C-alpha cells in the first residue's frame, strides 16, 4: 500500500463514493479524510468511520488550499448531478484528483482531464483525449486518436474504435461498440450491446440494437432533465 501523503475529500456518500474510497485507499497516495453531500441528502453522520459533512459548508473544515476533492457521482440525471457538483466545487476553489488504476494501459500522448476515474484493465491508445469529469469503468478499449468529451460515462466492455468522438454528457452502456471514425452528439445514450455503425448527429437520442436504432423517447425524457443542461 502506498504511503498516504495527500488529503482528499470525496463528494458523495453513495455506492460509487464507497467504491472510490476503496480504490483511493488501495491504489493511490491520497488519504480520504471525509465525505461531503448536500445537506438535504445527509442521512448519517459517518461512512467508514469518516465524517460526512454538508457540501454547502465544506470549506470551513476542509479548505481548498489544503484538501483536494473527487466528485463520486455516477450518471444520475444524464451526468448532470456530477457536472453540477464539479462546477460548484470548482467555484469554491477546489482542485480535483483523477484516479487511474495501475493496470490501465496508456498509449503515447494520451491526455486526461481532471476529476476522471478510470477503472482497471482499460486500454487507452495513443493520442486519445479524455475531457474533465469522465467515468470509465473496467475493461474498455478506446481506440487511437479518439476523443471523449466532458462529463461522459462509460460502462464496462465498451469498444470505441479509432478516430471516434463522443459528445458531452453521453452514456455508453455495457458491451456497446462503435465503428471507427464515428461521431456521437452530446447527451446520447448507447444501450447495452448496441453496435453503432454511423454518426449520431442529433443530440439527446437513445440507441439500441445491431445496428443501433433510435428509440422514440429522448435521453432528456428518460432522465427527466432539460435539454439545455444545468
Regions found by a protein language model. Give the residues of each.
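A solvent-exposed beta-alpha-beta segment
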Residues: 2-68
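A general structural motif
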Residues: 5, 32, 64-66, 93, ...
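Glycine-rich hexapeptide-repeat left-handed beta-helix
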Residues: 150, 155-230
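Left-handed beta-helix
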Residues: 76-84, 88-146, 157-160, 164, ...
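Short glycine-rich anion-binding loops that position phosphate/pyrophosphate groups of nucleotides
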Residues: 16, 74-78, 213
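Alpha-helical elements of the RecA-like P-loop NTPase motor core of helicases
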Residues: 18, 22, 80-83, 198, ...
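Phosphate-bearing ligand-interacting subdomains
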Residues: 41-101, 105
Amino acid at each position: 500500500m502506498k504511503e498516504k501523503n495527500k488529503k482528499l475529500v470525496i463528494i458523495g456518500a453513495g455506492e460509487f463514493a464507497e467504491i472510490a474510497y476503496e480504490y483511493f485507499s488501495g491504489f493511490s497516495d491520497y488519504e480520504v479524510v471525509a465525505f461531503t453531500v448536500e445537506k438535504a441528502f445527509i442521512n448519517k453522520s459517518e461512512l467508514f468511520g469518516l465524517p460526512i459533512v454538508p457540501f454547502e459548508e465544506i470549506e470551513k473544515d476542509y479548505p481548498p488550499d489544503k484538501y483536494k476533492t473527487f466528485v463520486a457521482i455516477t450518471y444520475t440525471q444524464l451526468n448532470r448531478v456530477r457536472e453540477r457538483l464539479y462546477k460548484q466545487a470548482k467555484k469554491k476553489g477546489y482542485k480535483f484528483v483523477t484516479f487511474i488504476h495501475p493496470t490501465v494501459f496508456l498509449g503515447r500522448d494520451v491526455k486526461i482531464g481532471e476529476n476522471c476515474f478510470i477503472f482497471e484493465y482499460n486500454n487507452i491508445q495513443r493520442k486519445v483525449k479524455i475531457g474533465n469529469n469522465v467515468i470509465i469503468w473496467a475493461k474498455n478499449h478506446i481506440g487511437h486518436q479518439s476523443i471523449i468529451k466532458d462529463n461522459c460515462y462509460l460502462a464496462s466492455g465498451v469498444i470505441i474504435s479509432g478516430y471516434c468522438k463522443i459528445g458531452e454528457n453521453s452514456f455508453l452502456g455495457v458491451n456497446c461498440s462503435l465503428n471507427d471514425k464515428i461521431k456521437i452528439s452530446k447527451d446520447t445514450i448507447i444501450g447495452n450491446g448496441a453496435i453503432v455503425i454511423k454518426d449520431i448527429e442529433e443530440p439527446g437520442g437513445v440507441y439500441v440494437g445491431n445496428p443501433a436504432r433510435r428509440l422514440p423517447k429522448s435521453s432528456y425524457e428518460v432522465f427527466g432533465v432539460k435539454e439545455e443542461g444545468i
